Amino acid sequence: MTTLLQQQGSANLWERFCQWVTSTENRFYVGWFGVLMIPTLLTATICFILAFVAAPPVDIDGIREPVAGSLLYGNNIITAAVVPSSNAIGLHFYPIWDAANLDEWLYNGGPYQLIVFHFLLGIFSYMGREWELSYRLGMRPWIAVAYSAPVAAATAVLLVYSIGQGSFSDGLPLGISGTFNFMFVLQAEHNVLMHPFHMLGVAGVFGGALFSAMHGSLVTSSLIRETTETESQNSGYRFGQEEETYNIVAAHGYFGRLIFQYASFNNSRALHFFLAAWPVIGIWFASLAVACFAFNLNGFNFNQSLLDSQGRVINTWADILNRANLGIEAMHERNVHNFPLDLAAGDQAPVALQAPAING
């Protein structure tokens, strides 16, 4: 009898836990994806703060030349970063227990892997949690689909690029200046600016910002007057009201006359789908661009494509960009490589064209 009561009690406890996890009445929806999201994001956040503030220098290139990234080692908020794990580690999984001691783990950049893996699991779970909550509320799943764009971008620069290049030392440093360095090196080695997927990503980000500003300003300019001049116009809206708060006909008429009629949406649903889809598709393509770079599918090469009648090169902007790429490539990791890969890959010129003949 006692055993039966204990089993029922444990079953009831589990059922109550399941109901709490999946309840949409909580102030903060947890969900089954949240059970994974909360510990992984907390772990990544705590480790990031500790590493950003106090981590010792990391031998990122694997040549015993450590790079200091933390605040306590002389950096400021702009220059500080969590330095990627060492090139000596490569793509090996490097948890704390694989190192001989904590000092070795820190020297080889172990915190970077810990942060990146937990962070990626956390944002994947957050995306799943968005879908889960939408499902339980009877909503469509497009919030999670939209969030997949930044998730894909983060995965590309933190994981896919490292895998393609063969080492986590090639991943994105977790800091402001480190991000800029990553962008410069990516451009130098892969000609990012000449890749069509990057161009689509730029169109998505800047176009999305433009369309968002246009939409917000049009709506704000065509609000239905509900207040006096001495009141805030925001007081004219009541949360949950059924009537429209702005005049879409007026906004459509204004924008149609400003440009031309068919440049303006006359369907609010189509308009908002467009506002969501444009930047999301653009960032998807930007993520695909980084995935291409990971496996050295680089931007277009139009170097020295114009020649005069004498066969001399007429420089284009592609040639000037290529010169900048070579300069950046020559300067980064200067103690690892003697020459940029593009310069070192040519045919070797023999020192002696012909061995001297010895006449006895």
Swiss-Prot record:
<keyword id="KW-0604">Photosystem II</keyword>
<keyword id="KW-0472">Membrane</keyword>
<keyword id="KW-0148">Chlorophyll</keyword>
<feature type="binding site">
    <location>
        <position position="189"/>
    </location>
    <ligand>
        <name>[CaMn4O5] cluster</name>
    </ligand>
</feature>
<keyword id="KW-0408">Iron</keyword>
<keyword id="KW-0812">Transmembrane</keyword>
<feature type="binding site">
    <location>
        <position position="272"/>
    </location>
    <ligand>
        <name>Fe cation</name>
    </ligand>
</feature>
<dbReference type="InterPro" id="IPR005867">
    <property type="entry name" value="PSII_D1"/>
</dbReference>
<feature type="propeptide">
    <location>
        <begin position="345"/>
        <end position="360"/>
    </location>
</feature>
<keyword id="KW-0464">Manganese</keyword>
<feature type="binding site">
    <location>
        <position position="344"/>
    </location>
    <ligand>
        <name>[CaMn4O5] cluster</name>
    </ligand>
</feature>
<feature type="site" description="Stabilizes free radical intermediate">
    <location>
        <position position="190"/>
    </location>
</feature>
<feature type="binding site">
    <location>
        <position position="215"/>
    </location>
    <ligand>
        <name>Fe cation</name>
    </ligand>
</feature>
<keyword id="KW-0479">Metal-binding</keyword>
<dbReference type="GO" id="GO:0016682">
    <property type="term" value="F:oxidoreductase activity, acting on diphenols and related substances as donors, oxygen as acceptor"/>
</dbReference>
<feature type="binding site" description="axial binding residue">
    <location>
        <position position="118"/>
    </location>
    <ligand>
        <name>chlorophyll a ChlzD1</name>
    </ligand>
</feature>
<keyword id="KW-1133">Transmembrane helix</keyword>
<feature type="binding site">
    <location>
        <position position="126"/>
    </location>
    <ligand>
        <name>pheophytin a</name>
    </ligand>
</feature>
<dbReference type="GO" id="GO:0045156">
    <property type="term" value="F:electron transporter, transferring electrons within the cyclic electron transport pathway of photosynthesis activity"/>
</dbReference>
<feature type="transmembrane region" description="Helical">
    <location>
        <begin position="29"/>
        <end position="46"/>
    </location>
</feature>
<dbReference type="InterPro" id="IPR055266">
    <property type="entry name" value="D1/D2"/>
</dbReference>
<dbReference type="GO" id="GO:0016168">
    <property type="term" value="F:chlorophyll binding"/>
</dbReference>
<feature type="transmembrane region" description="Helical">
    <location>
        <begin position="142"/>
        <end position="156"/>
    </location>
</feature>
<keyword id="KW-0106">Calcium</keyword>
<feature type="site" description="Cleavage; by CtpA">
    <location>
        <begin position="344"/>
        <end position="345"/>
    </location>
</feature>
<keyword id="KW-0602">Photosynthesis</keyword>
<comment type="function">
    <text>Photosystem II (PSII) is a light-driven water:plastoquinone oxidoreductase that uses light energy to abstract electrons from H(2)O, generating O(2) and a proton gradient subsequently used for ATP formation. It consists of a core antenna complex that captures photons, and an electron transfer chain that converts photonic excitation into a charge separation. The D1/D2 (PsbA/PsbD) reaction center heterodimer binds P680, the primary electron donor of PSII as well as several subsequent electron acceptors.</text>
</comment>
<keyword id="KW-0157">Chromophore</keyword>
<feature type="site" description="Tyrosine radical intermediate">
    <location>
        <position position="161"/>
    </location>
</feature>
<keyword id="KW-0359">Herbicide resistance</keyword>
<feature type="binding site">
    <location>
        <begin position="264"/>
        <end position="265"/>
    </location>
    <ligand>
        <name>a quinone</name>
    </ligand>
</feature>
<feature type="binding site">
    <location>
        <position position="333"/>
    </location>
    <ligand>
        <name>[CaMn4O5] cluster</name>
    </ligand>
</feature>
<dbReference type="Pfam" id="PF00124">
    <property type="entry name" value="Photo_RC"/>
</dbReference>
<dbReference type="GO" id="GO:0009523">
    <property type="term" value="C:photosystem II"/>
</dbReference>
<dbReference type="GO" id="GO:0009772">
    <property type="term" value="P:photosynthetic electron transport in photosystem II"/>
</dbReference>
<feature type="binding site">
    <location>
        <position position="170"/>
    </location>
    <ligand>
        <name>[CaMn4O5] cluster</name>
    </ligand>
</feature>
<feature type="binding site">
    <location>
        <position position="332"/>
    </location>
    <ligand>
        <name>[CaMn4O5] cluster</name>
    </ligand>
</feature>
<feature type="transmembrane region" description="Helical">
    <location>
        <begin position="118"/>
        <end position="133"/>
    </location>
</feature>
<feature type="binding site">
    <location>
        <position position="215"/>
    </location>
    <ligand>
        <name>a quinone</name>
    </ligand>
</feature>
<keyword id="KW-0249">Electron transport</keyword>
<comment type="subunit">
    <text>PSII is composed of 1 copy each of membrane proteins PsbA, PsbB, PsbC, PsbD, PsbE, PsbF, PsbH, PsbI, PsbJ, PsbK, PsbL, PsbM, PsbT, PsbX, PsbY, PsbZ, Psb30/Ycf12, peripheral proteins PsbO, CyanoQ (PsbQ), PsbU, PsbV and a large number of cofactors. It forms dimeric complexes.</text>
</comment>
<protein>
    <recommendedName>
        <fullName>Photosystem II protein D1 3</fullName>
        <ecNumber>1.10.3.9</ecNumber>
    </recommendedName>
</protein>
